[in-house]
């Protein structure tokens, strides 16, 4: 396990990295994401930060960004208002980023929730608990690959269930049949499909370091909701510690396909990639081996099937978005 002390000591080195790192955060309005953004901004030199907030969270998140402006006035903090359960909104976000930045150094994604109340599809016909945890995340990475590849040591960190992948319902990947959908199955499908598709992106972009991190149980607003539905995991990690650990994972060469960021702490060794080419990281900051599940999925071509299916979802969402826009203009 990587001790919190080692994490904190290493994170001081973030301040020695080149000034002007560009970081995009999706899911930083509360919980792990907000803590991660806080700790990154605390250490980074003149960072250029973009943070996405859903409409209902804009006011509170702007207040939070104001606190970062006060604590590190050398940075630039930009709020992007968007509903990330919609693929069309992701495309708009990417278009805005591309107009303002030639590169992205760090992409952080933790948006999402467990739909304890049941499935309620978006206007694009998707389960929002899956779109925030899978479709929108993949779309964001996919569309930002050119900007990520323009950075010297790009890093993507998706916070969900790296190392916890499980068999998929291959006949109903988006769990559209009500008999197949539960809040748990939607979570497991999101995590497993996320790993398989991120591996595909990593294989096509060998200089891009991609981490799928399972942070364990963390004391966040999401955990409060889980408690209301009878789920009470013991001994949760504080959001503050989780944010510090994310800053370590996002900037340390321990989780890199090549060096260029903060050196690996003395006494620790680089984490090994999964068989598919990404870093699956557990709550202790160590590599997680789940080849027992993943190797079989790859061997049978399930990763390719998931990719093709997801491309179809993106095409359908784009069509639904255009149809909705046309109706709004009538």
From Swiss-Prot:
It is found in: Membrane. It is a single-pass membrane protein. It is an enzyme of class 1 (oxidoreductase). It holds the Pfam family adh_short. GO terms for molecular function: oxidoreductase activity. NmrA-like family domain-containing oxidoreductase; part of the gene cluster that mediates the biosynthesis of notoamide, a fungal indole alkaloid that belongs to a family of natural products containing a characteristic bicyclo[2.2.2]diazaoctane core. The first step of notoamide biosynthesis involves coupling of L-proline and L-tryptophan by the bimodular NRPS notE, to produce cyclo-L-tryptophan-L-proline called brevianamide F. NADP(+) binds at residues 12-17, 38-42, 59-60, 80-82, 160-163. Notoamides have been shown to exhibit antitumoral activities. Notoamides A-C show moderate cytotoxicity against HeLa and L1210 cells with IC(50) values in the range of 22-52 mg/ml, but the IC(50) value of notoamide D is greater than 100 mg/ml. Moreover, notoamide C induces G2/M-cell cycle arrest at a concentration of 6.3 mg/ml. One of its GO terms (cellular component) is membrane. This is NmrA-like family domain-containing oxidoreductase notO. PANTHER family: ALCOHOL DEHYDROGENASE-LIKE C-TERMINAL DOMAIN-CONTAINING PROTEIN, YALI0E05731P. It comes from the Eukaryota. The chain crosses the membrane at residues 12-32. Glycans are attached at residues 180, 207. One of its GO terms (biological process) is alkaloid metabolic process. Belongs to the NmrA-type oxidoreductase family. Keywords: Alkaloid metabolism, Glycoprotein, Membrane, NADP, Oxidoreductase, Transmembrane, Transmembrane helix. Its EC number is 1.-.-.-. It comes from Aspergillus sp. (strain MF297-2). The gene is notO. Residues 158-202 are annotated as: Interaction with ASS1.
